[in-house]
Curated annotation (Swiss-Prot):
Record-stated family: Belongs to the endoribonuclease YbeY family.
Keyword Cell inner membrane: no
Gene that this polypeptide is encoded by: ybeY
Cofactors, names only: Zn(2+)
Predominant subcellular localization, coarse grouping: cytoplasm
Protein name as it appears in the record: Endoribonuclease YbeY
Protein keywords: Cytoplasm, Endonuclease, Hydrolase, Metal-binding, Nuclease, Ribosome biogenesis, rRNA processing, Zinc
Domain of life of the organism encoding this protein: Bacteria
GO annotation, cellular component aspect: cytoplasm
Gene3D superfamilies xrefs: Metalloproteases ('zincins'), catalytic domain
Cofactor details (free text): Binds 1 zinc ion.
Role according to the record: Single strand-specific metallo-endoribonuclease involved in late-stage 70S ribosome quality control and in maturation of the 3' terminus of the 16S rRNA.
Naturally occurring in which organism (per UniProt): Kineococcus radiotolerans (strain ATCC BAA-149 / DSM 14245 / SRS30216)
Chain sites annotated for binding Zn(2+): 120, 124, 130
Length: 173
């Protein structure tokens, strides 16, 4: 599985984005979702200005957003006993500065918010969406389960509540 994580942001609160941890989370999510071992994923961290440009260009919405996903081969999750087809999963672009604002509003660490956003972006690449309330509940519950599973696996405490667009899903869901 090819996972490339690049931090082009100037986010420097503390040590910046832990690209190794992000890479490990991405691998965990792809494994849990039974994505083919030969699939390729790119994760890019960008500044507010770059994210704002992408947001206008692709969504025709002003200002930066937290995460954007750019699917390539329309891969879907695998099933029990079967992985997805191999191919290019696509790109996930995260803005750590927006993540920091959302983390503060939600009461958890920026690093946890970045992990949530990367998981969220990967789920979008796999065909998940949150346009309807039922889709949102399914996607946010899955994203939270994946991040909590990853944090448990690496032995790091945390209980981040998913946020997207500055809206939080209650932690009990």
């Amino acid at each position: 599985m090819s996972i490339e994580v690049v931090d082009e942001s100037s986010f420097a609160q503390g040590r910046g984005v832990d690209t190794v941890e992000v890479s490990h989370l991405a691998r965990y999510v792809l494994d849990e979702m039974r994505v083919h071992p030969l699939a390729e994923l790119s994760v890019l961290m960008v500044d507010v200005e770059a994210m704002a440009r992408l947001h206008v260009q692709w969504m025709d919405e002003p200002g930066p957003t937290d995460v954007m996903s750019f699917p390539m081969d329309q891969l879907r999750p695998g099933r029990e006993g079967r992985t997805s087809e191999p191919g290019l999963l696509g790109d996930v672009v995260v803005c750590p500065q927006v993540a920091a604002e959302q983390a503060k509003a939600s009461g958890h660490a920026t690093a946890d918010e970045v992990l949530l956003l990367v998981a969220h972006g990967i789920l979008h690449l796999l065909g998940y969406d949150h346009a309807e309330p039922d889709e949102e509940r399914e996607m946010f519950t899955l994203q939270r389960r994946l991040v909590l599973g990853f944090l448990a696996r690496i032995g790091r405490p945390g209980d981040p509540t998913p946020t997207v667009g500055h809206r939080a899903l209650p932690a009990g869901d």
